[in-house]
Amino acid sequence: MQKFILLALSLALVLAITESFDFHEKELESEESLWGLYERWRSHHTVSRSLHEKQKRFNVFKHNAMHVHNANKMDKPYKLKLNKFADMTNHEFRNTYSGSKVKHHRMFRGGPRGNGTFMYEKVDTVPASVDWRKKGAVTSVKDQGQCGSCWAFSTIVAVEGINQIKTNKLVSLSEQELVDCDTDQNQGCNGGLMDYAFEFIKQRGGITTEANYPYEAYDGTCDVSKENAPAVSIDGHENVPENDENALLKAVANQPVSVAIDAGGSDFQFYSEGVFTGSCGTELDHGVAIVGYGTTIDGTKYWTVKNSWGPEWGEKGYIRMERGISDKEGLCGIAMEASYPIKKSSNNPSGIKSSPKDEL
């Protein structure tokens, strides 16, 4: 991004993309007004459809518009909106964005279990709230596109975070390297597990920057020349004790944490703002990262979760999810499959030096 005029134009584009798409109840009253709403939505999101496809997509959009409208009339602590997924069925959405084969694998033998310890076990007190964004340990929201690479984005958030904590430098790292090169256990756009990705980064001696190995949103051939220029290394990873939100709280108080959740519900698909308390199960199908926690004025506890569906989704790319519920697994299974990277020092590989373009 260049300075002055180009910077201003880029900022205007970002604001346009993240601007909320609103509609009035009257736009739902007739088929004609609904068509007008659909065309306005398509223009807002620059979605092109063939004539045949438009009719099919309009019917889906109409159903979703009614769902969003009816849900927002209810007394819930969160709201929905017609986002970029509004003409996708929930089944299509799940298959494309949350069907990434992140499964609860620790019940099976052979999974990467870290070093078998939990370094934060003896932590007695934690702050009332934590926001790693405000501490400068979180990069801007990214977009995985139509590729089931959420596991890579979840992994990278946690590694970027612990690297900033140890070095005081925030460096955007490469999800595409994981997609292309971490293929022994993980499956690129067809899904993967964060624990395997942490192990890959450790074994390879680090991971390169996003600038050196940019994201493409498809499975490519591993570029060995780029892979052999690691910028940030880790010393391993640990798993948070399963089904224990108190243990998860201790971990998040000290660094961003990778988690898996069930993100396939309609309310999650169209989440806009507020503390999400919606219906969801524990069929873990999406990798995200917790970058903080807090409590609302009315006393509702929440996790601050960074997603990888772009800044237009949710609260500028984030979702606040209810924390401390009665189910031990946590809302949407958030406490079932949490892990974080270990970095013992500020030392990093010398294969490539971070540039001003890399550091944020």
Swiss-Prot record:
UniProt region (Prevents secretion from ER), positions on chain: 357-360
Annotated EC: 3.4.22.-
Main location: cytoplasm
InterPro entries the record matches: Papain-like_cys_pep_sf, Pept_asp_AS, Pept_cys_AS, Pept_his_AS, Peptidase_C1A, Peptidase_C1A_C, Peptidase_C1A_papain-like, Prot_inhib_I29
Entry annotation: catalytic residues: 150, 286, 307
Chain positions carrying an annotated carbohydrate: 115
Gene Ontology MF term list: cysteine-type peptidase activity
Subcellular localization(s) per the UniProt record: Cytoplasmic vesicle
Disulfide bridge positions per record: 147-189, 181-222, 280-332
UniProt entry keywords in alphabetical sequence: Cytoplasmic vesicle, Disulfide bond, Glycoprotein, Hydrolase, Protease, Signal, Thiol protease
Modification after translation: The potential N-glycosylation site at Asn-115 is not glycosylated.
Family label: Belongs to the peptidase C1 family.
Other facts: The pro-endopeptidase goes directly from the ER lumen to the ricinosome, and the secretory pathway via the Golgi apparatus is not involved in the ricinosome biogenesis.
Protein name stated in the entry: Vignain
